[in-house]
Amino acid sequence: MLSAIQREKLTQFAQALIDQEAARVILPAEQPQSGFWFGGGNLCKSQDGGLYLCGRFRSAGDSRTGLEAGARGRELVIWRSTDRGQRFERVLSFSKADLSLPDRPVLSIEGSALHSTRNGIELFVSSEKDNIGYPEAWRSFQKEGTGVWTIERLTASTVKGLAEAPIDTVLTCRDPRWLHVKDPVVHDMSNGDLMLAFCTHPYSWTSSNSGYAIRAQGSARFQPAVYDFFPRGFTWDVAMSRITSLVNVPGCGVFADTPGLLLAFYDGGECVRQLEEHGGAVHRPRGYSCEELGGAAVLLESAPSRNERLSTNLPLFLSPYGTGCSRYVDVLQAPEGFYATWQQSQPDFSQALVMNFLSWEKANEILT
């Protein structure tokens, strides 16, 4: 799909966006210790030029303690910045009870995504819910007190109006291979359709995978989802390949004559559980659930199953601190440049949300 020079330039562009040394903390975790973070959301440009940011506060704990007592994914927050991300102020928040359906209480809030529309704003949010259950033939595999992940949507004319918006389930799956769906990612396609990418887990929780669904322009509903378009890797990302952001590859430099490409950022790891490293092995971050490492790939927008990894044998993005975790990248392409945010492991092993900005001038320089 890519020539050698295109691979080199696009990799440099991705690394300039996710610059671990240049990034600054915009939202720290609530406690300076492992298991605490803020993130799993995205940035969205408002009509007046401001930035909205959504994400969840995550506390160490076990969601199986129930709706009221469970501390884990306990709050979704929307923030606003009027100075290009220098400062953010809280606009709106949702508790687990706020996002619960009458017969499906939320056990843990997961990833979310804001999406600007012609009529206002959409908020896609995923959560673990009680009272869904595994399919009958697989029920014995469900651990006591756990739920199933689904994705919902709230719509309103303004961000503050989301507080009173009805909650509509847009994506759920009963196939045991992709039973849990979470962590929505929104991408406005060049033809006016909306691509909703998401993460899946099987009934057995042995891997993390990526799927997508298309909502045609003018339609209120998504077409049937595609669950197997981006296979897991063979090396550092053999257990997990979760897409977290889709960005149009700028049509400049070596890509001036190659339209319709998307740069995909994804989270990966060697195993869902933390592996015990052999004493003679090369010591390195390996990635596991909640401490994933970062990679990148390129997709053809019109046929996403045509894709090519930029991070084939090693991750591209590692935090210089803590466990090395660098995950949940989101990149907003704006008239003034590119805003990149991600969760970065800190020296205290919490994960802060960090930001880096790359100007169009610098992007053009890299890609030329």
Model-derived regions, located:
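Short glycine-rich, acidic/polar surface loops and turns
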Residues: S326-V329
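Beta-rich carbohydrate-recognition and catalytic domains
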Residues: M1-L107, H115-D183, H187-G322, A334-T368
